[in-house]
């Protein structure tokens, strides 16, 4: 059996967290985005994704839905990709 690399372990943990945020709407958006894109994220992008996972649910929901402006620390390419994914998410 092959040992997982550090980034593979981080990706697996991030996938688990993305699918189980505890806020159903975000579970669907983050979980589906993670399923589709997480395994291709490089380390700096994974850092950004993990930071997004640390944001409280209600706050993240407002950002993703465009209800409030996203702070500059979180307004990066990964967040833009997540929002673009949400815009194309089947309803």
What do the PLM-derived regions correspond to, one by one?
Residues 2-91:
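Positively charged, polar, low-complexity stretches
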């Amino acid at each position: 059996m092959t040992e997982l690399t550090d980034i593979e372990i981080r990706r697996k943990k991030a996938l688990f967290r993305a699918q189980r945020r505890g806020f159903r709407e975000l579970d669907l958006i983050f979980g589906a985005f993670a399923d589709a894109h997480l395994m291709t994220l490089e380390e700096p992008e994974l850092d950004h994704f993990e930071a997004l996972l640390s944001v409280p649910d209600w706050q993240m929901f407002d950002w993703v839905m465009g209800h409030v402006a996203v702070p500059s620390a979180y307004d990066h390419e990964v967040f833009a990709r997540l929002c673009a994914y949400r815009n194309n998410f089947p309803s």
